[in-house]
A protein has these predicted regions:
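Conserved N-terminal structural module of periplasmic/extracytoplasmic solute-binding proteins
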Residues: 2-108, 301, 325, 409, ...
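Extracytoplasmic/periplasmic substrate-recognition and gating elements
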Residues: 68, 167, 248-249, 286-348
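A structural signal for short loop-to-beta-strand junctions that line the ligand-binding cleft
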Residues: 100, 127-164, 304-306, 376-385
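Hinge/lid segment of periplasmic solute-binding proteins
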Residues: 105-154, 208-210, 215, 293-295, ...
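Extracytoplasmic/periplasmic solute-binding protein
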Residues: 146-150, 155, 177-230, 235, ...
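Conserved C-terminal helix/tail region of periplasmic/extracytoplasmic solute-binding proteins
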Residues: 165-166, 249, 374-425
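Glycine-centered hinge/linker elements that transmit conformational signals in sensory
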Residues: 183, 226-255
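Long, aromatic- and glycine/proline-rich binding clefts that accommodate carbohydrate-like moieties
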Residues: 292, 344-390, 425
Length: 425
């Protein structure tokens, strides 16, 4: 889920309301206050790349406006960076300080632990029917929707036109071999620039690795849904990355410690010539005055016919018993104005039909047209598998080691952990 930037100014008013709705948030769950009012605890991921465009400003604004319209319901906002949100939420759940509403990258493990309300319990029929059907279906586990799509994105190849021109490259690469040759040319003719930014650090290694695997007809699962992390196609993919990009110095020296945020910042600063990115990189590149192009992602033998699509998710926890209050808040958060504001702030793709119609007809989103075209052909993580969050966490920690060590061993170890997760679910 492109990513990501206009800074929203917090709309928090003075007084007690502002202190409740706009606080940075503690670790406790929501509850009923002494005055009889309910406080919902919202934990959300941060899509900003710096303090000035942190998602905290957006959620504080939504929370304040919601409480103004619903004085008996307060919203305590806690925004957490992507590197830490999974760990912090796990700690909160283990300690009993469960949030009411969580917006993050996965939901299925919470379903396995019977923590979540079904979507139909916390969304009005009007809000549910506005969700784009393919994304709503992706939120299902065994035919019941628990994950509520919040934003979506697709991936494409970004390239720096000025650096390409300096290197004498006239077209973006369409295959791995062309990408390697272009990277060599960039290294030779534009010294000091990272030819291809390969982020396999813990922020989103599962995404970068899946993109490359798709290019070799691989991926994390097979047609039957079983994990295939150490398939021959995937092993061959990482052997190519190691031998043809990492060892020759055509990317970062240690991709396993390099996060997406670093790669995006390097591209926006003109320090990286190519990378796989999502729409939020558009604004960053524009702010950095980078003359960029967008093209299909190169595969082993030609451009990918399907690309990685990402949806991030909203979910509602049962523990605090605030079903009705959560429904009111989510219906408010999913209004067209609020959804459009978030999508436009971070150059993300919509998940509701009303916002998709607005973005495709307003004429204000020409830069997103390549991504609108890619989305129908996107391939998604195995989100409905209740073990995916655990497997994804292992990929984030370890898969980057496959480009410095033995790919077969690294992927084999990951496959064993995935199989153990399946056996123990």
């Amino acid at each position: 889920m492109d990513k990501r930037v206009l800074a929203l100014v917090s709309a928090c008013a003075l007084g007690a309301l502002a202190l409740t709705s706009c606080g940075s948030g503690g670790s406790g769950g929501g509850g009923t206050d002494p005055d009889g009012k309910v406080t919902l605890k919202l934990v959300a991921a941060d899509y900003g790349d710096k303090e000035t465009n942190s998602s905290k400003a957006y959620w504080n604004k939504v929370a304040t406006a919601f409480t103004a319209a619903n004085p008996d319901i307060r919203v305590d906002v806690q925004v957490v960076n992507w590197n830490d949100i999974d760990k912090q939420v796990k700690t909160m759940i283990q300690s009993g300080n469960v949030p009411d509403v969580l917006q993050t990258g996965g939901y299925a493990d919470k379903v396995a632990d019977d923590l979540l309300y079904p979507a139909e319990d916390v969304l009005s029929p009007g809000t549910r029917s506005d969700l784009i059907d393919s994304f709503a279906r992706a939120g299902q586990v065994k035919g019941v929707q628990y994950g509520i799509p919040f934003v979506s994105s697709a991936r494409a190849l970004f390239y720096n036109k000025a650096l390409f021109q300096q290197a004498g490259i006239t077209q973006p690469p369409t295959s791995w071999e062309e990408l390697r040759k272009d990277a060599e040319q960039l290294k030779t003719r534009v010294p000091g620039v990272t030819p291809y930014a390969l982020p396999l650090g813990p922020e989103e290694a599962q995404g970068e690795s899946m993109i490359w695997e798709l290019g070799n007809d691989g991926g994390p699962t097979g047609k039957d849904g079983a994990y295939t992390l150490n398939s021959q196609a995937n092993i061959d993919t990482f052997r190519w990355l190691k031998a043809d990009l990492v060892d020759p110095g055509l990317t970062y020296a240690n991709p396993a410690t390099t996060d997406r945020k670093t790669a995006f910042a390097d591209f926006a600063a003109g320090k990286a010539a190519m990378l796989d990115g999502h729409p939020s990189l558009i604004r960053m590149a524009q702010d950095g005055k980078v003359d960029y192009g967008v093209a299909p992602i190169p595969g082993k033998s030609g451009p990918l016919t399907s690309t990685l699509g990402v949806a991030d998710w909203m979910m509602a926890f049962k523990k605090n018993g605030h079903r009705d209050q959560i429904r009111k808040f989510l219906d408010f958060a999913y209004t067209e104005d609020n959804q459009l504001a978030f999508d436009e702030t971070y150059d993300l793709m919509p998940v509701t039909q009303s916002v998709l119609h607005e973005m495709t007809t307003s004429g204000k989103h020409k830069d997103l047209e390549p991504f609108f075209a890619l989305l129908p052909h996107a391939v998604f993580y195995p989100l409905g598998d209740t073990t995916w969050d655990a497997v994804s966490a292992e990929l984030k920690k370890s898969v980057g080691g496959a480009v410095s060590g033995d790919p077969a061993k690294v992927l084999g170890d990951l496959q064993k952990k995935a199989q153990d997760a399946v056996a123990n679910r």
